[in-house]
Amino acid sequence: MLGACLRLLVGALCTVCSLGTARAYSDTSPLLGSNWGSLTHLYTATARNSYHLQIHRDGHVDGTPHQTIYSALMITSEDAGSVVIIGAMTRRFLCMDLRGNIFGSYHFSPENCRFRQWTLENGYDVYLSPKHHYLVSLGRSKRIFQPGTNPPPFSQFLARRNEVPLLHFYTARPRRHTRSAEDPPERDPLNVLKPRPRATPIPVSCSRELPSAEEGGPAASDPLGVLRRGRGDARRGAGGTDRCRPFPRFV
């Protein structure tokens, strides 16, 4: 009886811990708690270049040669042949404007963010906007697509399995902790943040030129003022010493 009660108690504790863990990490990654299915990368190529469609955090859409966390997409079917594409890392919907330019948006619009998927004979897929009649394309040339014509470059996509480690989607970016000079003194006991004292220049009145030997008088025979130092110090007194100091003062 006691063993059965202990087993029930351990089971209840495990259930509570698992629920707490799921709640604690529910917002750390867009992949947790999502019903969108597996990750997919839309690959397109020409004879020279190949790219994966990626949606950046600012909504910009471009291509990358290799798979990244921003090229990881989740694709779901809305109705027969209609799909919605969202960036797994940015949570932005792939949308299209009236000129055929694609972008990522947080707000879903059925007219701009829903595409009709067709599979071509070569096995590649194209995504057509029913509203604007343009194909999703990473190329610069935009033209209205008509069935039976060749699609524009970088508009035929092949769905590829995700090869980016899932750890890259969960790891948070490191933050750099900095301090400023306005912090309280107890946060900077060694005065590292405070600026070092600067030496003030010698006043102009204190700088003197050495007399030339060609000049007459006692100054010429005693250019360094060794013999006249005693008399000069007596004349200056305490005030003159403060006013004309040869050494810099630190402020």
From Swiss-Prot:
Protein's GO biological process: calcium ion homeostasis; cellular response to interleukin-6; cellular response to leptin stimulus; cellular response to parathyroid hormone stimulus; cellular response to vitamin D; ERK1 and ERK2 cascade; fibroblast growth factor receptor signaling pathway; intracellular phosphate ion homeostasis
Tissues of expression: Expressed in the parathyroid.
Compartments it resides in: Secreted
Single GO MF descriptor: growth factor activity
SUPFAM superfamilies for the chain: Cytokine (SSF50353)
Entry keywords, A to Z: Differentiation, Disulfide bond, Glycoprotein, Growth factor, Phosphoprotein, Secreted, Signal
Keyword Cell cycle: no
Glycosylation sites: 171, 178
Pfam families with a match to the protein in the record: FGF
Claim: Zinc-finger is one of the keywords in the record: no
Modified residues (Phosphoserine): 180
Coiled-coil portions: none
Protein family according to the UniProt entry: Belongs to the heparin-binding growth factors family.
Function field: Regulator of phosphate homeostasis. Inhibits renal tubular phosphate transport by reducing SLC34A1 levels. Regulator of vitamin-D metabolism. Negatively regulates osteoblasts differentiation and matrix mineralization. Acts directly on the parathyroid to decrease PTH secretion. Up-regulates EGR1 expression in the presence of KL.
Record note on quaternary structure: Interacts with FGFR1, FGFR2, FGFR3 and FGFR4. Affinity between fibroblast growth factors (FGFs) and their receptors is increased by KL and heparan sulfate glycosaminoglycans that function as coreceptors.
Entry protein name: Fibroblast growth factor 23
Organism name: Rattus norvegicus (Rat)
Gene behind the chain: Fgf23
